[in-house]
Amino acid sequence: NTPNEYERTLAVLKKTMDLQSAAVDEDFNPCELNDEELYELMRNVADDFGIVNPFPDKERFYDIYRTLKNFEDVTWTDIIEYGDRRFKFRIPEALIDEMEKNFIEGFQEVLIPEAEKFSPCLERLVEAHGDSHFMLTTMDNFYYKILNEMFSDNEMVDVKQTSIYEYEFTSEKFDLILAVPIFGVRDKADEQSTFICREYDMIAAENLALHLKSEGILSIVLPAKITFGGGRVKELREFLQSMYCIKEIAELPSGIFENTAVKAYLLTITTGRTDEVTIKRYVTNTKNPRKDGIGRLVVQDDTFVLEDELTDMGDWNVDRIFESQDEDWIRFQESNVKKQELGTVASIFRGKAVSHKDPTGNIGVVNISNIGEYEIDYSSLDHLEEEERKVTNYLLKDGDLLIPARGTAIRVAIFKEQIYPCIASSNVIVIRAIDESLSITYLKLFFDSPLGRKMLITRQQGTAVMNISYKELNNIEIPLPSVEEQKQIADTYTREFEVYKKTIQEAESRWSSVLAELQERI
């Protein structure tokens, strides 16, 4: 967060008013500063805050100062909160309430980095746990001054201007760390960084864990990438699991933060001992948290896995953990039906990125919006002008199964060959049977089933918007009965679907006729 001009100006005015209220004469009696003394005091305060004089016009300063004196006291928390919330990252109070549950009775050394994000709950936290000693950090000089003012009379609070994205930001260790680091930004640490990852959120997780005391707890919010990412992110997961104990992994609801759609998780990491890892999925008690706010977080699903089991999984996929304990999944695993990984009977690939559209182009492009619940809408395809040989590897074939890779809903439809060549856009996944051992119609029916839909959902790479990895689909284990049984199922589906469409068309036609007759009588 970066303080805005209004925050800075309010801070200068408040500090000036506080100093004026505390002013005394030679006999230590309260005294009123004259206008010149007051203006000079304001300039000194601005300089102390590292701010350019916000009132070069003296008369404007006097007018605003006198006006503010007639209002209720402005608090330092009010100043941090002031400004357009769209440009301020704030942690919802409901989330802070969950993080606060890690406090224990008695004295603790507590670290809250980038503490300005925790307003307006910061003062409440410190007051509620008055037996503990708090270190509050911030990277910003202005917020450093504000936090010092906020807790100037509290000996149990120290404020430090430092960065948790640098080694040895402090030499101290803590019993409890509550952190919501920078995430959802493209900036990374330079390549000379000695941390495992270059992303700032991942750096924070590694660095803060190093500052835990024995039996210490780190409660940290991280983007979903920590649960599934490969490469260095996977190395970080392995580091955390080998050096510490993962106590809890909790999926946070989409839209919990006002100014980012990044899917996030609340992780609880400890230097203590634990054999079980609690797995949770939170929802909000309001339907639309962005519009209605969040009263509290409610646990929708709750289970656990053994720490060794989590290590063997290779990732922290919460959906997959719940799937493995789902009744439909257990029945499927225990059934005698033949099971096969999808990648062994089908080829799976992403469509092609299309940068230039041409309404009169020779090649049709199937986008997510064209994929319906049952069929593809060919009437509204985009088109591309391109030599067919240049898109040969992407040309769709009759019977290909198309699934949106991104979006808000999972739909599965079978491509029917058109009189012109077609390709899928890059946001569409194509599944093509390698041979006759797999019926694509049967596969569509399976993916439309509750179990099949759950399997697709667990292959999402956690973001607020659906994002399915086509590579992950290779590993989905599907029921694969005999070719004859698949054909019987597919034939019945196709036949009855045609009856369904005809029935709908006849009903719509009849309804239109009835409406027309009734309207003529009006």
Language model regions located:
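Non-catalytic DNA-recognition/assembly elements of restriction-modification systems
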Residues: 304-358, 482-522
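Sequence-specific dsDNA recognition surfaces
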Residues: 340-354, 369-398
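Flexible, glycine-/basic-rich loop-and-beta segments that form/coincide
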Residues: 259-338
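A short glycine-rich beta-alpha junction/loop motif
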Residues: 267, 421-429, 461-487
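A short beta-sheet element
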Residues: 392-394, 401-447
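Conserved S-adenosyl-L-methionine
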Residues: 82-179, 184-186, 223-224
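Conserved Class I SAM-dependent methyltransferase catalytic core
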Residues: 197-268
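Long recognition/docking surfaces used for binding and targeting
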Residues: 5-84
